[in-house]
Amino acid sequence: DGQWALRSPYDGSVQQTIPARNLWIRLLTARIETGEPYIVYIDTVNRQIPQHHKLAGLKVKTSNLCSEITLPTGIDNEGNQRTAVCCLSSLNLDTYDQWKDDPQFVEDVMRFLDNVMTDFINRAPDEFAHAKYSAMRERSVGLGVMGLHSYFQQKNIPFGSVMSKVW
């Protein structure tokens, strides 16, 4: 129920003070109505940061828009600036039956993502030096899925049904 200082991202100066509860309610209302903003508890992220990032003296300061990627940025233990880079892709579950029995499929997709990272490292202009350095050090890639609802519709499986939960 205390006051919350709204600070300038440029100089940290307090621009306005408002009731913290009011701010929290506005955030939650916007989240319910629009799906945004995404909320990241950065202190928790940094407490759980992988050991090799801790040893490099790195911290996560931000994430991508949807908050599924939290990679460290800043100056590492070798004195080099890092700009986080991650190559993401999604498998479309609408086409799951076409690739589900191929034991090599996911490995091939991951190799493709790594090849995209190599291509970025080789082709990025000098202005992207910090991103190239980070890409070379981390080679961060991510693979997710999309189209679950479409797949269930194809198979006449009601969303939320027992069948959808055991699939």
Predicted segment positions?
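Glycine-rich and small/hydrophobic secondary-structure elements
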Residues: 165-167
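Glycine-rich phosphate/pyrophosphate-binding loops
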Residues: 158-161
